[in-house]
Every structure is written in C-alpha cells, then in structure tokens.
Swiss-Prot record:
Zn(2+) 1 binds at H54, H56, H113, D138. This is Hydroxyacylglutathione hydrolase. GO terms for biological process: methylglyoxal catabolic process to D-lactate via S-lactoyl-glutathione. One of its GO terms (molecular function) is metal ion binding. Thiolesterase that catalyzes the hydrolysis of S-D-lactoyl-glutathione to form glutathione and D-lactic acid. It catalyses: an S-(2-hydroxyacyl)glutathione + H2O = a 2-hydroxy carboxylate + glutathione + H(+). Binds 2 Zn(2+) ions per subunit. Belongs to the metallo-beta-lactamase superfamily. Glyoxalase II family.
Length: 249
C-alpha cells in the first residue's frame, strides 16, 4: 500500500499536511475544515486521524468540523494539553509510539513555542515511500523557529537540538510558509554566509513561481538556520529577541 504526502496551503500562510495511505488519510494541524473536506472528498478518501502538535487556534480550529464529517477519526495530541485540546481521543507524551495509518510514529517533546508542544516523527523504516518525516508544528520553521509564547530560549535550544539529531534526510514539515522572510532576516545577520544566500535565492525563485518552499530537511536546517546553528541558549535568545522586533523593509 503506497503512501504519499501532500501540502495544503490555507489562510494567509498556514500549511496543512495530509498523509495518505491507500484510501485513508491523516491530517496535521488543520486550521480550517472545509479545504480538507473538499480535498479528501475529491479523492474519495476517508479521514482516519488528526495529529495536533499544539493548541493554537490556527492549528486546531478545523478539527471539530472534520469530526462532524468523520466522527470516528482519532485525534492524537499531548495529554498535557487536554484542557486546551479537549477533543483529543489519543493522549500522548514524549517517547510514546502511536499507530497512525498502520505505521508507528514517534512522539517528541519539543515544548518552547507552547508548554506542551509535540512533534511526530515517521521513521524511514516505517514508511519508505515517504522517507523520514517530522511534523514539527511551530517549533522548527524552515529557516527559523517559533516565537517563545510559553517557553524560554533554553527550552527552544533543547527542542532544536532534539530535532537536529534526526537523520539529515528527514523532511521538515512545519506549519507555516515563512521561509523567505526567515532567510531574508538571516542574511541581514550573516551577509557573508553563502549557504544562507544560496538558499534564499532558491526560495525566492520558488515563491515567484507560486510554489511552496516546504518541506525543508533537517540537513538544510543544520546548514542555514541560524536558530538551529546557535551554540547556546543565550545565543538563541539574542537571535529570537532580534527576530521578534524585525520587519522586512
């Protein structure tokens, strides 16, 4: 049974991920329901599971609507966030394995953006059609990282270190298309960095053609993401504070 992975842009910059195996699908962080329902119905697919990385409205807002259409779909979320994701049916925590679409996913605690943020990893051996994949929500972005709404620079540094330990080929399926802005900011911090400049130019070309820059890869983030390259929590904190107040010209 072959698998495929699809990115579905919604709202201003959200990206939903839809993982398909056979005639079933799982969706990650559905901000809204209708585009997902339309996408699945056009392909005659059944929704088997919803994966929630954290509780923010632009990640869980569509789940109740999906459950109205597919009431038997599982909702996998952090047990520590039950009060904020009350419709979860499978509660998980760091180190857990959870079966989705017949495959075993690993759960990682990557709390920083929020206090109970998790990521889901599909190891390559579990689904060779996809290769290794991480659904990382708003912790790791392509070329950046999430704002620290409920965590500290030390929390984010720890979370990014955990993600950086995944295989280089791991697809980074984050939840927003922020790459161009993230890399423009990074160039201004490191104007002589060839890896960042080359990646930025490639992303600008993609976006001008109307294409997504996602997914990235762990290897690419190691090379050209200043937050993932930060040697300490203090350095990451300085970068994050600067980025929080930065606006593109």
């Amino acid at each position: 049974m072959q698998s495929s992975l699809h990115a579905l842009p919604v709202l201003q910059d959200n990206v939903l991920w839809i993982w398909v195996r056979g005639d079933e699908a799982a969706v990650v962080d559905p901000a809204v329901a209708e585009p997902v329902i339309d996408w699945l119905q056009q392909r005659q697919l059944q929704l088997s599971a919803v994966l929630q990385t954290h509780h923010h409205a632009d990640h869980i807002g569509g789940t109740p609507g999906l459950l109205e259409r597919w009431p038997d779909a599982a909702v996998v979320a952090a047990g520590a966030d039950r009060s904020r994701i009350p419709f979860q049916t499978i509660s998980v925590s760091d180190g857990d394995q959870v079966t989705v679409l017949g495959r075993s996913l690993q759960v990682l605690d990557v709390a920083a953006h929020t206090s109970a943020h998790i990521a889901f990893v599909i190891p390559e051996q579990e689904d060779p059609d996809l290769g290794p994949v991480v659904f990382c929500g708003d912790t790791l972005f392509s070329g950046g990282c999430g704002r620290l709404f409920e965590g500290t620079p030390a929390d984010m540094h720890r979370a990014l270190r955990r993600l950086s330990e995944l295989p280089e080929s791991t697809k980074v399926c984050c939840a927003h298309e922020y790459t161009e802005g993230n890399l423009l900011w990074a160039i201004q911090q490191q104007p002589q960095d060839a890896a960042i400049r080359q990646r930025y130019d490639a992303v600008v070309d993609l976006r001008r053609r109307g294409e997504l820059s996602l997914p990235s890869s762990i290897g690419e983030e190691r090379r050209s993401n200043l937050f993932m390259r930060a040697a300490s929590a203090e350095e990451l904190g300085r970068l994050r504070r600067h980025k929080d107040h930065w606006r593109a010209a």
